[in-house]
């Protein structure tokens, strides 16, 4: 056997080992992913909606120059599967200079669950946390949800999060998965 043949044999052997290693790695990832998926169902507490008293909830959405996404976000919030009489959507306009405020006002006129909170002049433009703290003064609900202006939650996300918060008295806050528009 020449050196070239020996080198090719070693290279072939290394290649085969790497291929099998990658296959085994993918298999392990799949198994653990499936186990995690099954665990998530165990951890979820499904709620009998007919016998569960959902808390009132205010959704706070701070927005500063978000004209490209705010309409879709508010529409997404209005589509949430949550008792309509217990939901308030407070959109915080933090000194936007684009058409964000006009878009919000269209929703305010069409649905009484949507409320516009304009950050007072001189107090705006100082960050998301400042806008949220100012808007907290008008919240009257039992629970508060905070979404960014470019978030579109799943239809049942708020219902699930609120139920977890109420059912587990040790929790003070819950965080769900989210997806953004931009």
Protein language model annotation of sequence segments:
Residues 1-51:
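N-terminal membrane-anchoring/stem segments of glycan-assembly enzymes
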Residues 42-182:
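Internal catalytic domains of large membrane-associated glycosyltransferases
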């Amino acid at each position: 056997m020449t050196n070239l043949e020996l080198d090719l044999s070693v290279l072939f052997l290394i290649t085969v080992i790497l291929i099998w290693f990658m296959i085994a790695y993918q298999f392990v990832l799949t198994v653990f992913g499936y186990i995690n998926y099954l665990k998530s169902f165990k951890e979820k507490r499904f709620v009998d909606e007919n016998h569960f008293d959902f808390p009132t909830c205010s959704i706070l959405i701070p927005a500063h120059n978000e004209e490209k996404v705010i309409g879709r976000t508010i529409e997404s919030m209005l589509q949430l599967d949550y008792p309509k009489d217990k939901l308030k959507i407070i959109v915080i306009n933090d000194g936007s200079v684009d058409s964000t405020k006009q878009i919000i006002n269209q929703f305010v006129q069409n649905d009484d669950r949507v409320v516009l909170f304009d950050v007072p002049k001189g107090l705006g433009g100082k960050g998301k946390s400042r806008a949220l703290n100012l808007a907290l003064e008008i919240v009257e609900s039992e629970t508060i949800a905070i979404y960014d202006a470019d978030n579109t939650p799943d239809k049942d996300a708020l219902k699930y999060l609120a139920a977890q918060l109420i059912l587990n008295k040790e929790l003070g806050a819950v965080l769900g998965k989210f997806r953004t528009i931009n």
